[in-house]
Amino acid sequence: QRALAGEVWRACTAAPSKKGTRLFCQAPTGIGKTMSALFPALKAMGSGCGEKLFYLTARNTTQAAAEDAIARLRAVQPDLALRSVTLTAKEKACLHPDAEGHPACLPEVCPYANGYYDRIKNALAALLDGSGQFSRAALADTARQFTVCPFELGLDLSEWCDVVIGDYNYLFDPVVHLKRFFD
């Protein structure tokens, strides 16, 4: 754990541009990789090295581990001013009853897409006044309440978050690449 935490710290603080470098790590399950990566990265952000942390994984269980680690950090330091969002694939996040894994993201077809930009401000305000940790369930609940697309809500909310948790395809896949952050 200590060696990994040190490497994460060095990767986050090494570059003169204060943007850090990329660090890819692989280790067995259960050794504390999540906290060993998150804690020094967040500490580096607090020192002015970077504005946003992307915790990208291949599995939902690892995303849940990152959410849990952030919740534990909040429990230890309740006044921690940290916002995190977990992004979910559009197919999994879609609330349209007729979508069945194939989102129909057209305003003419989907009530969550129709008028999205008329309602998004209120949905974001409601979330940003809350806990600061935004899971898939929290996004879905807010999306239902304000009738907005939960996938787009998560993307828009990510602009105000310090930590973005999601699938690594958001970085590597040109089809779902997060252009707002990685272009």
What are these regions (language model features)?
Residues 3-7, 36-40, 167-173:
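Well-ordered alpha-helical segments embedded in enzymatic catalytic cores
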Residues 9-13, 34-49, 70-73:
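Walker A/P-loop NTP-binding motif
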Residues 1-5, 30-37, 62-63:
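Phosphate/oxyanion-binding active-site loops and adjacent basic polyanion-contact surfaces
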Residues 177-183:
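Short, conserved "post-DEAD/DEAH" coupling segment immediately C-terminal to helicase motif II
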Residues 17-39:
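Walker A/P-loop
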Residues 18, 29, 49-164, 168-172:
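A substrate-engagement module of RecA-like helicase motors
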Residues 37, 65-69, 177:
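Residues at alpha-helix caps and immediate loop-helix transition turns in enzyme cores, especially N-
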Residues 1-25:
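Conserved pre-motif I regulatory segment
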